[in-house]
From Swiss-Prot:
Residues 40-71 are annotated as: Disordered. One of the primary rRNA binding proteins, this protein initially binds near the 5'-end of the 23S rRNA. It is important during the early stages of 50S assembly. It makes multiple contacts with different domains of the 23S rRNA in the assembled 50S subunit and ribosome. Residues 44-53 have a biased composition (Polar residues). The keyword Iron does not apply. This is Large ribosomal subunit protein uL4.
Length: 202
């Protein structure tokens, strides 16, 4: 299929139908996005059981003859300073997603972006100096506000010029993910980045 390059007389760029003209599979995209978000969860909650609390190796008093209730350790859950009976453990929230499924979901998302005219292709996206004002002017010319910019390689000037603008993110072609593609109103891709994405997903 052919995608139009934004700009007067820029022409078109040919891309694979496999990566950019696939039917939208909502269930698969939902599964992959959920798995991606789950993988970012920390899951760092932890408490100590009686065996993990420091101390308590010695029996506090002898088993019989003292008249007191029998006790084997001062770290019993019923004692102050003891372990937790049912201690919380760190959780791994990650979900398994096969490479084939992930690739198909990414193809599905990109194809839907093309159908909804949310994918903007440009020859290149670069700024001469790390100036936010210059970069903002470029975005205004293209009529973009909430946008993900995908470049073949993000140089220092582009990164510094864009990092302070709300709702604008910049990434390399190899770093695209399902959540960032969906989250932005528009996705601006350079021709070289488009070819790299096609190579990865085609």
């Amino acid at each position: 299929m052919e995608l139009t390059i934004n700009g007067a007389g820029k022409g078109t760029v040919s891309v694979s139908d496999v990566a950019f003209a696939r039917d939208f599979n909502e269930a698969l995209v939902h599964q992959v996005v959920t798995a991606y978000l789950a993988g970012g969860r920390q899951g760092s909650k932890a408490q100590k059981t009686r065996s993990q609390v420091s101390g308590g190796g010695k029996k506090p008093w002898r088993q019989k003859g003292s008249g007191r209730a029998r006790a084997g350790t001062i770290r019993s859950p019923i004692w102050r300073g003891g372990g937790k009976t049912f201690a919380a453990t760190p959780l791994d929230h990650s979900q398994k997603v096969n490479k084939k499924m992930y690739r198909a979901a990414m193809q599905s998302i990109l194809s839907e972006l093309v159908r909804q005219e949310r994918l903007v292709v440009v020859e290149e996206m670069a700024v001469e100096a790390p100036k936010t004002k210059q970069f903002n002017a470029k975005l205004k010319d293209l009529g973009l506000e909430n946008v993900l910019i995908v470049a073949d390689a993000v140089d220092q000037n582009l990164y510094l010029a864009s990092r302070n603008i709300p709702h604008v993110d910049v990434c390399d072609a190899v770093a695209i993910n399902p959540v960032s593609l969906i989250a932005h109103d528009k996705v601006l891709v350079t021709v070289s980045a488009l070819k790299k994405i096609e190579e990865m997903l085609g």
